[in-house]
Every structure is written in C-alpha cells, then in structure tokens.
C-alpha cells in the first residue's frame, strides 16, 4: 500500500506539472509579443515627461521633423490638420530628428522657438531623437515590435498613423502631405 500511495502522489504531481506546462505553452502562443504606442514614455521639447498612455482613445499622427528641410513647410499643414481635428480625438506628435542631412541642428529651445515663430505650432513636440536609437521609432519601424509592418524612415517628415488603441495602422513617406485624403479619410473613419 505504501508503494501505491507513492505512485498516486507521483501521478498527482505529474498531472499538476503537466497542467502548469500546458498553461505556460498556451499563454506563450496567445500573448502577443507586440506593444502598443500606449506602452511608451518620452520627454517633451520642454523636458517634461510624456506618457503615451494618455493618448488612449485618440488617433495619432507621428512625424519626424526638421527645421532646415525642404519638407519643413509641412509644419503649417500639420498644424492645420491638428487644429481641424483636435476636437475629434486626434493629435499630432512631432519628433525632431537630426539624422537626415543634419537638418535639425538646434537645441530644444531653438526648435521650439522656430516652430512657434514660423509655423505657430501648438501640437505636441517631443525631445529630439535619433531614429536608430529611439524606442518609439524601433516600435514604429519593426514588425516584430508593432505586429503590423516594417518601415524604413528614409528622410524627414515620414508619418505613422496609430489608432485609438495604440496600434500602428500605416506608414506614409515624406512626400505625403498632411492634408492628404488618405490621412483625413482615416481620421474621419472613411
């Protein structure tokens, strides 16, 4: 009887171990390895902490910006887009970047003054980043991170559209104008 008791104990332990292993395997296959935009934090141009979780429920256009680029006049249309749709749960987030042609050499103070004086920018501008090392841009550009697409940011003013749940929807190149129907239709849900 002692041997029977030991066998039952071993079998019970093995069943528990099997159930735990099966649960772990199930979780591994059902849990997505991708994050959402809402998992990130960054610094604003003014140096304040910014939690992207605060954007839950809003559509977001993220753009890498530069003050000395041929596409710099897009600031005007980015601001117009933001002003038109900000009451409809839409925001624009600008990330100054000096990676392409050294076209954003200024300090945070310089960038803020330039954007305000020349384009009246009121949408959220973040601290200057490098595309190659920014965690948010890693998420935006790697399918293994965002679960949607791989993208190569080739120049300034590349745009990424992110839905209300923080999921990446689309990548658009520099020459896509901020008021392009593809963007406005997406904001309007068309």
Task: Describe every region a protein language model picked out.
Residues 64-68:
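Amphipathic alpha-helical repeat scaffolds
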Residues 30-53:
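N-terminal "domain-start" segment that seeds a small globular fold
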Residues 17-26:
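Sec-dependent N-terminal signal peptides
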Residues 6-17:
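Positively charged n-region of N-terminal signal peptides that target proteins for export
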Residues 56-61:
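Local sequence-structure signature of Cys/Sec-based thiol-disulfide redox active-site neighborhoods
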Residues 137-138, 143-190:
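Thiol-/selenol-based redox modules, centered on thioredoxin-like
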Residues 71-134:
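Structural microenvironment flanking redox-active thiols in thiol-disulfide oxidoreductases
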């Amino acid at each position: 009887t002692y041997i029977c008791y030991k066998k039952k104990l071993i079998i019970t332990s093995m069943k528990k171990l099997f159930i735990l292993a099966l649960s772990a395997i199930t979780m591994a296959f059902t849990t997505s390895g991708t994050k959402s935009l809402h998992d990130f934090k960054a610094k604003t141009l003014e140096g304040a902490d910014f939690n992207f979780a605060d954007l839950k429920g809003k559509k977001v256009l993220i753009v890498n910006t530069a003050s000395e680029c041929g596409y710099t006049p897009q600031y005007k249309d980015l601001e117009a887009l933001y002003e038109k749709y900000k009451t409809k749960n839409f925001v624009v987030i600008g990330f100054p970047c000096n990676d392409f042609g050294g076209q954003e050499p200024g300090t945070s103070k310089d960038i803020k003054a330039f954007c305000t004086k020349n384009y009246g920018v009121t949408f959220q501008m973040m601290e200057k980043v490098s595309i190659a090392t920014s965690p948010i841009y890693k998420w935006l550009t790697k399918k293994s991170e965002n679960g949607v697409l791989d993208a190569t940011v080739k120049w300034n003013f590349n745009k990424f559209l992110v839905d209300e749940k923080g999921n990446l929807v689309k990548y658009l190149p520099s020459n896509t104008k901020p008021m392009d129907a593809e963007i406005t239709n997406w904001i309007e849900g068309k």
